[in-house]
């Protein structure tokens, strides 16, 4: 099976990922060392590596595939997503230490879905972590912002990663 070039060369470890901020590198390294993450809100322009960072973290934390729920919120964005998929997934015990719900393009979620998700984040914080990626963090309700560690990813100078 052929893979896209971007998938073949996607960074899989912290040392592969090109950070624009050394403090962010150190933060990610500490999460990997501790084998735990808080709820995360990864923001930045399209193509800055938000989803790549999320997937790299899941790989580095050795999260079992059965403990990962990936959702593209630009395709599924309403409250039924939270009620049907996220609640069911997050309310069961993980195979490992915790589950991860990756909501890619979370800024597409409706405000009602976000409000509902807030309760799920609170109720299942011991067994599930949320990683939200978004281009427009102002579209995420304050209640979600307050429950996530914000992580803005700046655009990388192309020469920083083409040299690798």
Which ranges hold each PLM region?
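P-loop/Walker A NTP-binding region and its immediately flanking N-terminal helices
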Residues: 1-164
């Amino acid at each position: 099976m052929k893979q896209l070039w971007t998938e073949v060369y996607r960074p899989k470890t912290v040392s592969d990922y090109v950070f624009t901020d050394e403090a962010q590198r150190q933060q990610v390294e500490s999460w990997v060392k501790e084998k735990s993450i808080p709820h995360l809100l990864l923001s930045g322009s399209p193509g800055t590596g938000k989803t790549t960072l999320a997937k790299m973290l899941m790989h580095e934390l050795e999260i079992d595939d059965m403990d990962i729920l990936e959702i593209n919120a630009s395709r599924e964005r309403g409250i039924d997503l939270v009620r049907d998929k996220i609640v069911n997934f997050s309310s069961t015990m993980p195979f490992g230490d915790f589950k991860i719900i990756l909501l890619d393009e979370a800024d597409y979620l409706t405000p009602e879905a976000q409000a509902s998700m807030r309760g799920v984040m609170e109720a299942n914080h011991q067994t599930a972590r949320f990683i939200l990626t978004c281009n427009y963090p102002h579209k995420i309700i304050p209640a979600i912002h307050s429950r996530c560690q914000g992580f803005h990813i700046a655009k990388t100078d192309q020469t920083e990663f083409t040299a690798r």
